[in-house]
């Protein structure tokens, strides 16, 4: 049996410590993956700093991390989509389950079968690792019935005639959401910084607007004139003012437009939600418990192989080995734009 090592959080607001960890076994509908690349996310450092204040069920020591790409080494009972030796990309849910065997920051991790996709050989592990958490967040907001409930993506989509607003198109979630919404048959209008306009349009957005412009709400209102709105997905960073502006702009746009009146939020709802409009905070991990994960992680493998889905944003490899994960988290706290920080494992 191989030896497993993990970057462990010993306690609340403590730095990661690399040490030997139990070698995991594949339970029912689960696979064990040898991690070749992992990405870091804001939820990782937030959980590291805040622990049970953020997630009351968290106990220590804990292995954090959500995004991995690697090779299947074992499959559990009931697994039909994978076999040992397969290349995969997947969303590790250890923070949600409070199960360190399912945390990404280690050499061998347990994944749910329905939270993983086959990885084509043409796509490097380090670039694939940017996808999972952002993908899960996007599919919850876009396709779960208790959120926007949009039509499911296809390699040959049927046009719906509706237009979706995605605020934050150059974020990791935004890059996934644009592609998914277009593949589901929706026109996408998005916001981002001007230097990312080409990026979001290359992913399928028909128009992009500068979210920092004082006229942004008027610009969006004009862009949606005469269109049927499919609702909005509001994605923003950790700065409270930016998050509030994003939520309010999306809610107001949906309220003023013809069409659906729902906004999926990556931030808490503001105090004054317009009459007739509904909104809900996105919990990405909820997708593991419903049909959307089966449908969309199945679609992801097909779309990656077909070349119709791009692993975006760009991966920036900031180190090699588990010892580099803490540095990656520290760098992420300083802020990044249109890229995702990745650590490779030898």
Curated annotation (Swiss-Prot):
Residue sites binding substrate per the record: 133-140, 269-273
Leading EC class: oxidoreductase
Gene3D superfamilies: Medium-chain alcohol dehydrogenases, catalytic domain (3.90.180.10), NAD(P)-binding Rossmann-like Domain (3.40.50.720)
Record keywords, A-Z: NADP, Nucleotide-binding, Oxidoreductase
EC number: 1.-.-.-
Binding site for NADP(+): 43-48, 170-173, 193-196, 211, 251-252, 336-337
Pathway it works in: Secondary metabolite biosynthesis
Signal peptide residue numbers: none
Any one Pfam family match given in the protein's UniProt record, by short name: ADH_N
Role this protein plays: Dehydrogenase; part of the gene cluster that mediates the biosynthesis of nigerpyrone and its derivatives carbonarone A and pestalamide A. The biosynthesis pathway begins with the polyketide assembly by epaA to form phenylacetyl triketide precursor from successive condensation of two malonyl-CoA, presumably with one phenylacetyl-CoA starter unit produced by the phenylacetyl-CoA ligase epaB. For the nigerpyrone biosynthesis, the reactive polyketide chain is released as an aldehyde through the R-domain. A nonenzymatic cyclization and dehydration may create nigerpyrone.
Family classification: Belongs to the zinc-containing alcohol dehydrogenase family.
UniProt name for this protein: Dehydrogenase orf1
Gene: orf1
């Amino acid at each position: 049996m191989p030896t497993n090592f993990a970057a462990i959080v010993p306690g609340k607001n403590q730095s990661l410590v690399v040490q030997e960890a139990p070698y995991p076994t594949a339970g029912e509908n689960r696979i064990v993956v040898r991690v070749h690349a992992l990405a870091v996310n804001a939820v990782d450092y937030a959980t590291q700093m805040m622990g049970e204040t953020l997630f009351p069920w968290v106990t220590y020591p804990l292995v954090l991390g959500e995004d991995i790409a690697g090779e299947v080494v074992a499959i559990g009972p009931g697994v039909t989509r994978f076999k040992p030796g397969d290349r995969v990309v997947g969303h590790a849910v250890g923070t949600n389950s409070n199960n360190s065997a399912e945390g990404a920051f280690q050499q061998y991790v347990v994944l749910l079968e329905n939270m993983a996709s086959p990885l084509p050989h043409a796509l490097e592990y380090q670039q694939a690792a940017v996808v999972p958490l952002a993908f899960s967040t996007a599919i919850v907001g876009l396709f779960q019935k208790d959120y926007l409930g949009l039509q499911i993506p296809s390699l040959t989509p049927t046009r719906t005639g509706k237009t979706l607003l995605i605020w934050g198109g150059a974020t990791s979630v935004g890059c996934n959401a644009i592609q998914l919404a277009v593949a589901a048959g929706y026109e996408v209008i998005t916001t981002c910084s001007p230097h990312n306009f080409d990026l979001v349009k290359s992913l399928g957005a028909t128009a992009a607007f500068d979210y920092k412009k004082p006229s942004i709400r008027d610009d969006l209102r004009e862009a949606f004139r005469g269109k049927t709105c499919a609702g909005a997905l509001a994605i923003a960073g950790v700065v409270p003012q930016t998050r509030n502006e994003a939520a309010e702009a999306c809610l107001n746009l949906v309220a003023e437009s013809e069409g659906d009146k729902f906004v999926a939020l990556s931030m808490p709802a503001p105090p004054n939600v317009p009459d007739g409009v509904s909104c809900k905070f996105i919990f990405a991990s909820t997708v593991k418990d419903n049909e959307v994960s089966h449908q969309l992680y199945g679609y992801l493998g097909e779309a990656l192989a077909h070349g119709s889905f791009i692993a975006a944003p760009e991966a920036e490899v900031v180190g090699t080995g588990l010892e580099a994960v803490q540095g990656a988290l520290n760098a992420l706290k300083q802020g990044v734009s249109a890229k995702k920080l990745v650590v490779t494992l030898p």
